[in-house]
A protein has these predicted regions:
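Basic, Lys/Arg-enriched C-terminal extension of HTH/homeodomain DNA-binding domains
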Residues: 188-214
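Two-component/phosphorelay signaling modules centered on CheY-like receiver
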Residues: 2, 7, 15-36
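The feature encodes the CheY-like receiver
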Residues: 19, 60, 65-68, 75, ...
């Protein structure tokens, strides 16, 4: 697994010793980190600034004074795509392991029981950052696809729908009451705008992003 570059690891723990130890560990593995002493401080940061479009993950203590890690996680889940962009790894004591298992079922990436092995934790962090990177890439591809679809004219959309259904040019021309040559022109424009070379490739791209015409 290739290490993820330009990544950020957020640490939320009310124990200063834990924050310092994690900051040192992450620095030693050449991972950039930002630490927060409370869930409230992290939530304030999230609300006040846009998160960078780069791989990120969150190390979150389960039990903290004030807002707990569980309460923060519930709030973050309500933000569209947040826990996919910033996978959450819970840091938990032995007594909280059953609770941590439940959070994984609810969308957390993983949990790590204290005291944790440095290598095990860093390995999980790297996996979370990989997942974040994949999600960001897929999201970027989806946005680019939607932008290309929005650039199609109404006629091009009509031709595209029939093309991905496998309808031959002659039948498309008959259905739309246009010439075969006009169909060929629109078909070529659709392929060009959608950056594909065949009807099969076009259908696969649309299907992969849930945009296949009904």
């Amino acid at each position: 697994m290739e290490p993820v570059t330009n990544a950020t690891v957020y640490v939320v723990d009310d124990d200063a010793d834990v924050r310092d130890a994690l900051a040192w560990l992450l620095r030693s593995r050449r991972l950039y980190s930002e630490s927060f002493a409370s869930a409230e401080d992290f939530l304030k940061m999230v609300e006040e600034r846009a998160l960078p479009r780069q791989p990120q993950c969150l190390l979150l203590d389960v039990r903290m004074t004030g807002m707990t890690g569980l309460a923060l996680f519930d709030l973050l889940k309500q933000r569209d795509g947040f826990i996919q962009t910033v996978p959450v790894i819970f840091l938990t004591g032995h007594a909280d392991v059953p609770t941590a298992v439940q959070t994984v079922k609810q969308g957390a990436f993983d949990f790590c029981e204290k005291p944790f092995s440095d290598n095990v934790l860093v390995d999980r962090i790297e996996q979370a950052l990989q997942q974040s990177a994949v999600y960001l890439e897929e999201t970027a591809h989806r946005h680019a696809l939607l932008s290309r679809l929005a650039d199609l004219t109404e006629r091009e959309n009509g031709v595209m729908k029939l093309v991905v259904e496998g309808v031959p040019n002659k039948l498309i021309a008959d259905q739309l009451d246009i010439s075969v040559r006009t169909v060929e022109v629109h078909r070529a424009r659709v392929f060009d705008k959608m950056q594909v070379k065949s009807a099969v490739e076009l259908a696969n791209v649309l299907r992969a992003h849930g945009q296949l015409p009904q």
